[in-house]
């Protein structure tokens, strides 16, 4: 698999993270593999039906993220894991800025790859887990032209009635998203601290915005 194909499926997987659901009650009743099956189908259908998304309309994708991300993703945990130990020393303001910039980075990084989605389908493998499990890995396979692409989602069962399952990491062909960014973020934190990381993310997002503008 080449970098372009990897980016394409990382983009699809990231949009699954951002897609969320329209009904929290429905999500709470769904098994994690059933949830991923439905979200994957909805995401692919949305991409195929929306010309703006296909052309990488970042504003529209960000609007989708803003409206749907919270129900199905523990984005605070995802960001905290990517930042690493330094997260514990971050102020509430720094934590919010890190989440905001990281979300924009993910959307802008993968929005261009979404235009390449065409006739693909996603098959989710049946989940083998105990009803008492609090964390699971849901495995899926993207099928279309060329070799199938493996996607995996790490999910947690959130406490409280009606909370359901939430995604906190994803794997595209053996590469976990959070771990990939953790190594990048660690270099910036070691050199310039948390504020330096925030500034670097903001600058990267501005540069990506100019390229897409």
Model-identified regions with their sequence ranges:
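N-terminal export leaders
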Residues: 3-11
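Cleavable N-terminal signal peptides
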Residues: 14-16, 25
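Sec/Tat signal peptide C-region and signal peptidase I cleavage site
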Residues: 21-28
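Early exported N-terminus immediately downstream of N-terminal targeting peptides
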Residues: 29-110
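Surface-exposed, polar/charged faces of alpha-helical domains
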Residues: 30, 49-56, 60, 89-93, ...
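Surface-exposed, charged secondary-structure patches
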Residues: 108-149, 204-213
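Short beta-strand edge/turn micro-motifs at domain boundaries
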Residues: 148-180
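Low-complexity, intrinsically disordered terminal/linker segments enriched in charged
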Residues: 169-213
């Amino acid at each position: 698999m080449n970098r372009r194909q990897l980016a394409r499926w990382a983009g699809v997987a990231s949009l699954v993270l951002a897609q969320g659901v329209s009904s929290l009650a429905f999500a709470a009743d769904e098994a994690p593999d059933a949830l991923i099956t439905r979200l994957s189908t909805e995401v692919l259908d949305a991409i195929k039906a929306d010309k703006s998304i296909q052309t990488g309309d970042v504003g529209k994708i960000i609007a989708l993220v803003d409206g749907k991300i919270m129900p199905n993703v523990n984005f605070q945990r995802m960001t905290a894991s990517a930042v690493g130990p330094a997260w514990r020393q971050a102020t509430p303001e720094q934590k919010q800025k890190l989440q905001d910039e990281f979300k924009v980075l993910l959307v802008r990084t993968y929005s261009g790859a979404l235009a390449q989605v065409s006739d693909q389908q996603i098959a989710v493998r049946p989940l083998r887990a105990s009803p008492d499990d609090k964390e699971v890995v849901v495995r899926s396979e993207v099928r279309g032209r060329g070799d199938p692409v493996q996607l995996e989602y790490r999910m947690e069962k959130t406490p409280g009635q009606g909370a359901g399952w939430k995604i906190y990491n994803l794997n595209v062909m053996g590469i976990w998203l959070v771990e990939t960014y953790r190594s990048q973020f660690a270099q910036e934190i070691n050199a310039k601290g948390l504020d330096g990381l925030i500034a670097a993310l903001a600058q990267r997002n501005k540069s990506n915005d100019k390229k897409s503008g």
